[in-house]
Curated annotation (Swiss-Prot):
UniProt lineage: Bacteria, Pseudomonadati, Bacteroidota, Cytophagia, Cytophagales
Protein name: Large ribosomal subunit protein bL34
Gene Ontology BP, a term: translation
Family matches, as NCBIfam families: rpmH_bact
Family: Belongs to the bacterial ribosomal protein bL34 family.
Region span, Disordered: 1-52
Organism: Cytophaga hutchinsonii (strain ATCC 33406 / DSM 1761 / CIP 103989 / NBRC 15051 / NCIMB 9469 / D465)
Feature: compositional bias, Basic residues: 1-19, 31-42
Entry annotated with the keyword Lipoprotein: no
InterPro entries per record: Ribosomal_bL34, Ribosomal_bL34_CS
Alphabetical keyword list: Ribonucleoprotein, Ribosomal protein
Length: 52
């Protein structure tokens, strides 16, 4: 049986990245809550190294 977690950075970024959080009101609420709490990384976009 295939495991349920099949990691992919693209899917991870599309679902939980900064841009996708900013798209919805609730996503912006998540960001605000994480800022208020003083999180070092707001979204997974801050963890995944970018090209360039």
């Amino acid at each position: 049986m295939k495991r349920t977690f099949q990691p992919s950075n693209r899917k991870r970024k599309n679902k939980h990245g900064f841009r996708s959080r900013m798209e919805t009101a609730n996503g912006r609420r998540v960001l605000a809550a994480r800022r208020a709490k003083g999180r070092k990384r707001l979204t997974v976009s801050d963890e995944i190294p970018r090209k360039g």
